[in-house]
From Swiss-Prot:
Family (UniProt): Belongs to the pterin-4-alpha-carbinolamine dehydratase family.
Keyword RNA-binding recorded: no
Alphabetized HAMAP family for the sequence: Pterin_4_alpha
Reaction(s) catalysed by this chain's protein: (4aS,6R)-4a-hydroxy-L-erythro-5,6,7,8-tetrahydrobiopterin = (6R)-L-erythro-6,7-dihydrobiopterin + H2O
Biological processes annotated in GO: tetrahydrobiopterin biosynthetic process
EC number: 4.2.1.96
Protein keywords: Lyase
NCBIfam families named among the record's database cross-references: PRK00823.1-2
Protein name per the record: Putative pterin-4-alpha-carbinolamine dehydratase
Alphabetized PANTHER family for the sequence: PTERIN-4-ALPHA-CARBINOLAMINE DEHYDRATASE (PTHR12599:SF0)
Species of origin: Natronomonas pharaonis (strain ATCC 35678 / DSM 2160 / CIP 103997 / JCM 8858 / NBRC 14720 / NCIMB 2260 / Gabara) (Halobacterium pharaonis)
Taxonomy, superkingdom: Archaea
Top enzyme class: lyase
Gene3D superfamilies, per the entry: Transcriptional coactivator/pterin dehydratase
Amino acid sequence: MSDRLTDDEIQAQLPAAWDRDGDEIVRTFEFESYLEGVGFASAAGGLAEEAFHHPEMTIGWREVEVRLTTHDAGGITQKDIDLAERFDELAE
């Protein structure tokens, strides 16, 4: 199990485009089309499966909201920060 990060650690490490929402970090990725968003969600799901760390993803019209938390730790851990960074790279 991963250890929860402190508030200071979260603030220092949170990727720029992500926000904190309680015990989760969240980002809405925007795309040119609905299908581009679906493709991103599928690829992000593959990365999540590789990391064995599964986010909540909501697919909307030309956007995908991603929420990350570590349930067994009861909050935000390094796993969340690391996966957020991988999703950012995927979206570039």
